[in-house]
Design a protein with these regions (language model features):
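N-terminal first-folded block
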Residues: 6-43
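Vicinal oxygen chelate
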Residues: 2-3, 7-15, 56-118
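Residue-level recognition of oxygen-bearing side chains
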Residues: 19, 47, 73
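Conserved active-site tyrosine of GNAT-family acetyltransferases
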Residues: 20-24, 78, 106
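N-terminal beta-strand motif that seeds the catalytic metal site of vicinal oxygen chelate
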Residues: 1-21, 62-64, 114-118
Length: 118
């Protein structure tokens, strides 16, 4: 039986998006498609899709996204278990909703609701 909350997306964020794109394309031959000035979609060919982006206010990090039925309800549960909302909820272009939270040790994890491509 499939797990009800699969990991559906990953993100690699750093200061220089183009440098990261060139690195991962060169190392893994990933297909990379820019969608915004600061962000590109990554299609590795098999497995889950992801993104590479630039965020000046953050140190480099990797985030994965977990599919949930209701982002707001998931954030409430997370906070009741000792996590903290980091950002969102916010809509994304394909109609989904995303948010981020920090686990009890400060790891940033994403949530996604209703995104067809994720």
């Amino acid at each position: 039986m499939p797990h009800p909350h699969p990991v559906v997306h990953f993100e690699i964020l750093g200061h220089d998006r183009k440098l990261l794109e060139e690195f991962y394309k060169g190392v893994f031959d990933w297909q990379i498609e820019p969608v915004e000035e600061w962000y590109s979609l990554v299609k590795p060919g098999s497995g889950i899709n992801g993104g590479i982006g630039a965020r000046e206010q953050h140190t480099g990090h990797v985030t994965f996204y977990v599919a949930v039925e209701d982002v707001a309800a998931a954030l409430e549960l997370i906070e009741s278990k000792g996590g903290k909302k980091a950002w969102g909820p916010q809509p994304i272009p394909d109609g989904g909703i995303v948010a981020g939270f920090l686990d009890p040790e400060g790891h940033l994890i994403g949530l996604v609701q209703g995104a067809p491509g994720m």
